[in-house]
Swiss-Prot record:
<dbReference type="GO" id="GO:0008137">
    <property type="term" value="F:NADH dehydrogenase (ubiquinone) activity"/>
</dbReference>
<dbReference type="GO" id="GO:0042773">
    <property type="term" value="P:ATP synthesis coupled electron transport"/>
</dbReference>
<feature type="transmembrane region" description="Helical">
    <location>
        <begin position="370"/>
        <end position="390"/>
    </location>
</feature>
<dbReference type="InterPro" id="IPR001750">
    <property type="entry name" value="ND/Mrp_TM"/>
</dbReference>
<protein>
    <recommendedName>
        <fullName>NADH-quinone oxidoreductase subunit N</fullName>
        <ecNumber>7.1.1.-</ecNumber>
    </recommendedName>
</protein>
<dbReference type="GO" id="GO:0048038">
    <property type="term" value="F:quinone binding"/>
</dbReference>
<keyword id="KW-0520">NAD</keyword>
<feature type="transmembrane region" description="Helical">
    <location>
        <begin position="74"/>
        <end position="94"/>
    </location>
</feature>
<dbReference type="InterPro" id="IPR010096">
    <property type="entry name" value="NADH-Q_OxRdtase_suN/2"/>
</dbReference>
<feature type="transmembrane region" description="Helical">
    <location>
        <begin position="404"/>
        <end position="424"/>
    </location>
</feature>
<keyword id="KW-1133">Transmembrane helix</keyword>
<feature type="transmembrane region" description="Helical">
    <location>
        <begin position="163"/>
        <end position="183"/>
    </location>
</feature>
<feature type="transmembrane region" description="Helical">
    <location>
        <begin position="272"/>
        <end position="292"/>
    </location>
</feature>
<keyword id="KW-0812">Transmembrane</keyword>
<keyword id="KW-1278">Translocase</keyword>
<keyword id="KW-0874">Quinone</keyword>
<keyword id="KW-0813">Transport</keyword>
Length: 484
């Protein structure tokens, strides 16, 4: 019997983040600072180092270790770096909000670190086992984060819904994995792909793939498995919603790629009709229901469902170009979502959450910088030419057309036009509606945090603007990660 010695150097990002999380836990345990400065800066530093390690140790590599359970490649490197950097951006918005409400505890940052560890494991998952373990580590941390505000009935209700539906989706995914294992006699994605190409025991394999697709679609928030998204986005504390709408989206796309592309790519022909249904349903449900929303967070939740539909359009193409477009779309959307939800955290104060669209009345008169950033973000989400959102939609649609899915591409364009209505409605409120006196007093930035937050808002807006003017670097990075 031969024993393969694992190459621990390939798993350096995960090893570092686990060690750093333990270090942050110890430091926070002995910290008496109510602002948790050491915990915050150590968390941000750990995530930045993780991004550097991911790109430096795994870019251009294509190796499998830990008996096939761990895969080090360029796709994993890009996903890990994106997840870590998006988490840094999301967590930077949270500190004033949490401090203003007496919620600034070390547990928030520790849960975010454990969630990142789960996302890193997903990004390099080389088997069904490692992917499921990474997913559960991520999910458990997110369940706890949604319930982080213990005194909020809304947060408790959202957490319960998320936990129950998430557990059901995880069970369905696990059942699908068990059927795939039964049909292929292996947990390794490379072996599963080889067997799937030969169509061994196709009926059991196909049923397993359907269950797995349902589980992954739930994690991505695609219709008709989207029931948790509006309630969780609205009920969770805004910093948690901000985090939930950024890095975990990239991890969900990575899970999709590992399971249904690396593992079950040869079965794309059978998957194609199901992927198309998910894309159409998400575009339809997300855009139509978002139109009637008055709560800004809930509107953005349905917007996220619609964006998941565009991501599914990229996967429906079934080509490397389509997969690269889906990855680029997810990263671009996450940056835009950080700006949108970040704006809510900036404008909110204790006793006033700034969650209603009406709360944004006359924002341009009170805070023109914030209004300008929100304009950039929402115009980009709409997909106006010259923005990063336009390039994201263009690449996805191009991949769909090249794959012969012209009716699907036309439907996606029509859905995007419909979706423009609710984004422009918010901008109309921001720029043309008069502010109410009582709202004007409440929506000032949190005391002592205005300069730091203003800088962060500007950085987020500049990132959206620069990626819209110069998208080539990020597009090339995503394409190189897929071997293009």
């Amino acid at each position: 019997m031969s024993f393969e010695t694992p190459d621990f150097s390939l798993a350096l990002p995960e090893i570092w983040l686990l060690a750093a999380t333990c270090g942050v836990l110890v430091v926070d345990l002995f910290s008496s600072d109510p602002r948790r400065s050491a915990t915050f800066y150590l968390t941000q530093g750990a995530l930045l180092v993780t991004a550097v390690l991911a790109l430096s140790t795994q870019w251009g590599v294509n190796e499998v270790t830990f008996s096939g359970h761990y895969m080090a490649d360029s796709l994993g490197a890009v996903v890990k770096a994106s997840v870590a950097l998006l988490s840094v951006l999301a967590l930077a918005y949270t500190r004033p909000y949490l401090g203003d409400r007496g919620l600034l505890q070390g547990e928030f940052y520790l849960l975010a670190l454990f969630a990142n560890l789960g996302m890193l494991v997903i990004a390099s998952g080389g088997s069904l086992l490692s992917l499921y373990l990474g997913l559960e580590l991520l999910s458990l941390a997110l369940y706890a984060l949604v319930a982080y505000h213990r005194d909020s009935r809304q947060a408790a209700e959202a957490a319960m819904k998320y936990f129950v539906l998430g557990s059901l989706a995880s069970g369905i995914l696990l059942y699908g994995m068990s059927m795939v294992y039964g049909a292929t006699a292996s947990l390794e994605l490379s072996v599963i792909a080889e067997v799937a190409g030969r169509h061994s025991d196709p009926l059991m394999l196909l049923f397993g793939v359907v269950f797995m697709l349902v589980g992954v679609a739930f994690k991505l928030g695609a219709a008709p498995f989207h029931a948790w998204v509006p309630d969780v986005y609205q009920g969770a504390p805004t910093p948690v919603t901000l985090f939930l709408s950024t890095a975990p989206k990239v991890a969900a796309v990575a899970l999709f790629m590992r399971l249904l592309v690396d593992g079950l790519g040869p079965m794309h022909e059978q998957l194609e009709p199901m992927l198309m249904i998910l894309a159409v349903a998400s575009l339809l449900v997300g855009n139509l229901i978002a139109i009637v929303q008055t709560n800004f967070k809930r509107m953005l939740a349905y917007s996220a469902i619609a964006h998941a539909g565009f991501i599914m359009v990229g996967f429906t193409a079934g080509t490397d170009a389509g997969h690269a477009a889906a990855l680029f779309y997810t990263i671009a959307y996450s940056i835009m979502a950080a700006g949108a939800f970040g704006m809510i955290t900036v404008l909110a104060r204790s006793g006033f959450e700034a969650e209603e669209i009406a709360d944004l009345r006359g924002l341009n008169e009170r805070h023109p910088v914030y209004a300008g950033v929100l304009l950039l973000v929402l115009v980009s989400m709409t997909g106006i030419p010259g923005t990063v959102g336009f390039y994201a939609k263009y690449l996805v649609l191009q991949a769909a057309v090249e794959a012969g899915h012209i009716p699907l591409a036309i439907f996606a364009v029509v859905a995007a036009v419909v979706g423009a209505f609710y984004y422009l409605r918010v901008l109309k409120v921001v720029y043309f509606d008069r502010p109410e006196a009582e709202v004007d007093a409440d929506t000032l930035p949190a005391p002592g945090a205005s300069s730091a937050i203003r800088s962060l808002v500007v950085v987020n807006g500049v990132a959206v603007l620069v990626l819209g003017i110069f998208p080539e670097r990020l597009i090339a990075l995503c394409q190189a990660a897929l071997g293009l």
